[in-house]
Amino acid sequence: DQGTACTGEHAHNFCLNGGTCRHIQSLGEYYCICPEGYTGHRCEK
């Protein structure tokens, strides 16, 4: 489950370094799809 696009504050502020925020509603979790070269929960590494 790749989730859905994040909305509101999460859409713009959750992921770092150009990552794409995704929301998994069934888990209430947010995660990021990171651009190449970045890793970490919020693409911070």
Curated annotation (Swiss-Prot):
Broad class of where this protein is predominantly found: secreted
Location of the EGF-like domain: 2-44
Positions in coiled-coil regions: none
Database matches in PROSITE patterns: EGF_1 (PS00022), EGF_2 (PS01186), EGF_3 (PS50026)
Role summary: Has both toxic and EGF activity.
Homology family: Belongs to the EGF domain peptide family.
Disulfide bridge map: C6-C21, C15-C32, C34-C43
InterPro entries, sorted: EGF-like_dom (IPR000742)
Record keyword Aminoacyl-tRNA synthetase present: no
Native source species: Bunodosoma caissarum
GO molecular function, one term: toxin activity
Protein name per UniProt: Toxin Bcs III 15.09
Gene Ontology cellular component annotations, sorted alphabetically: extracellular region; nematocyst
Cellular location(s): Secreted; Nematocyst
Keyword vocabulary terms for this entry: Disulfide bond, EGF-like domain, Nematocyst, Secreted, Toxin
